[in-house]
Amino acid sequence: QMCIRDRVLLAASFSLQYLSFVSQTIYQESTSHLEELLHKSNNMLKEMVRKNVSYLHLYNRFLESTSDADAIQAYIEKAQQDIGFAGFYFLSYDGNYMTVTGETGYLGLQTNLDEKLADGEDIVVNAALPGKAQMLVFICPETQGSYRGFAYDAVAISYYNDAVLKLLDNSAFQGNASNYVIYRDGRVVIDNSVNRKKTIYNFIAMLRDSSDLSEEEILTLSDDFAQGRSGNMKVTLGDTRYYLVYEGTAVHNWTMVGLVPVNIVNAS
């Protein structure tokens, strides 16, 4: 017959297995919900990019049909009113621009624009103007020409990041979900973090400096980002344990990342 000690050990074993099963079930259900929310934001971001690139090609066709500066200005100002973009730029390969009103300046783009334009492909990048908020800029090199004496190699429209962030809904989990859009090398395109204490410029570097992940785990995650894979894991930042979910996008080799505190998700 089974002695009391064996029964206790067997009961303890069953208890541990049950707790492990419950923990794994909670983890799978929680990350599945997070992945669903991230996928929804991903689709909305892709649709935003598709629509705005389509607008740029439409504007290019108009620019090819006329060289009348006043007509061009009226057309673009009407388009801006209808669509709601922040700015329209005639852009040279070195980042200098002119607006339809004739204002000139330099668009601080986070990329080597001349190399990108040489490829002849549409571009979506982060940019900043002095004293203004970060912007997401859509660039189309389909048409080159001159506007009010300014020679341009591409046209572009911009949105302030606040407008883009509306797509990355962090209202779930009582507003405790942080979302990021990153390049595959970890550089941050869009930072939609809650309770932000400092700007994150590279997500991988942030994890290396501030998380409990080993170097091997970080390298594996970096490879997932580089290959556009999807996945999930737990990570500790400071004193808080988080679910981290990520999904590659079809937009310019970006990856979307979501971070939500474990205790918030498990309480939902």
Which residue ranges define each predicted feature?
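Helix-start (N-cap) segments at beta->loop->alpha junctions
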Residues: 144, 156-168, 185, 250-254, ...
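Juxtamembrane extracytoplasmic/periplasmic/luminal helical "stalk" adjacent to the first N-terminal
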Residues: 7-68
